[in-house]
Amino acid sequence: MRLGLVIEGGGMKCAYSSGILDMMMDDGIKPDYVIGVSAGAACGASFVAGQRDRNRRFFVDYVERPEYMGWTAFFRSKGNFFNLEYIYQDMTGAGGEDALDYDAIMKNPCELWAVATDAETGKPYYFNKSDLHPYDYSVYMATCAIPIACRPVKINGHLYFDGGCSDSVPVRRALEAGCDKVIVILCRTKDTVREPEKHQRLYRTLLRRYPKMIHNLDVRHEKYNRTLNAIRKLEEKGHALIIAPEKQLEITTYTRDPKELQKLYDTAIREYPHIRERLLTFCEDHIE
C-alpha cells in the first residue's frame, strides 16, 4: 500500500499545516510520496528532512525581519514582496541560519515533489528532490513566486510562478504516481467554495506578458472547487483523508503578526487530536 501526502499552499496560512506536520512527525507517520505547493512544498521539505519545528520558526520567529517580507524586502529584492532569495537561499541553503537538512532528504526513501507553474505555458511543472542542491533551493523560490507579489523565478532557462496557479491541490498527480491512499492537508476548511480572484484588473495589467497565467488566475476558483469536490469523493471511498482547519482562518497569505501566526500553529496542535485516531488507522502500515 503506497501512501501519499499532499500539502496545499497558502502563504502564511501554512502555519496551520506546519503544526499538523509536526504532530505527524511525533506520531512517526512515514509516507512514501510527498508533494506540496508553494509554502506547502517548503513545509513538506522540512517534514521529509525530519526537522521538527523548523517550519514554525520560519512562520513565527523570522517573519518580522525586514529582509523576510514586506516593502523593505520588496525593494531589496527588486520586486518580491516575499524575499524568496533570502528565505530559500540565504536562510535555507547549506551554512544558512536555519538550513534545510539536504542529506536527510536524500537519505529518506520518500519521494519529494514541488509544483511550480510555467509562466509561458501556464502548465504545472513538477520538480523532485533530484532538482535540489544544498546551496540552491530555487525550486522552492519558484513554487512560492506568487504572481504580482513576486517576480517569476528562472530555472534551466524557464520562468516559473507559484504552483497554486496551475495545480493547487495535486492529488491527481499523487494518484498517478501510484499512491493508493492520500493524506491531504488544507489550509482552508474542507467545505470551502473558492471565489473568483480579486484585483483582476491589476493582475491582467501586470501579467500581460504572460497570457496563460492570466487565464489560469481567471479560472483558478473553478478548478479549485472541482478538485476539492473530487477529493471529498475520494475521502468518502476511503482513498483520501482530509486534514483541514475546523473554522475558516482569519490569517491571510500576507499576515506578518508573529502572535497571530503562533496562534494558528497552536490551533493545528489543538485540532490534531480530533483527527488523530482516523489518521493513524488510515496510515497504519506507515508508522514507525
Residue map of PLM features:
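Patatin-like phospholipase
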Residues: 1-37, 45-288
